[in-house]
Amino acid sequence: MISIRVSLLTVLLPATAIAQVAQPRVAGPPPYRGFAPGIDYRSFVERARSLADRDTLRCNTSRNTAQLIECGVAIRDPSDAARFYLSAHFVEGRADVVAFKDSAGFGRGDAPGTALVTRTKRDLTRIFGRPRPNGRSGWEWRYGRKAIRLSWRGRGTARWVAISLNDYDVMDRIGRYVKAAGSRKP
């Protein structure tokens, strides 16, 4: 009887030990201008207010639930005087998307819009390392279920850049509050 118990223990103990070993966590991305994917609402508000450039942080709560919030403000980062429109979307108090938007080069012949894109690419590469291409005018850095995305558009000398910090684990929770779109066919 004892030999059966011992043999069962020798078979089961390694299996339970393997089951208890946690999967290694992927390190999250470094923060960008003090913000990171999945940042909590309170930390976002504190940082956004400290960077607000003659603007008031505005937040709107969903009409259907208080668990969905959108915020936005014009900011100026004192470290390099960069200006952005900062916005974020929160699900259950955590940001699924934090976005920085900027533009340059309207009505000028010296192509400052091109310089904006070049400067933004250089800045993000310095922080996050080598990017993966994402389409014709986009880059991406992946950190498990979190990602940093840069996209840019242009017309003439004008350029628009958008940097988004995405947390897909938080984004998946939105399904609890938003119904799937129905069929559009009559």
Residue ranges, per PLM feature:
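Compositionally biased P/S/T/G-rich terminal and signal peptide-adjacent segments
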Residues: 72-92
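Non-cytosolic coordination micro-motifs
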Residues: 20-70, 97-186
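Short, functionally important structural connectors and interaction interfaces within domains
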Residues: 5, 24-27, 87
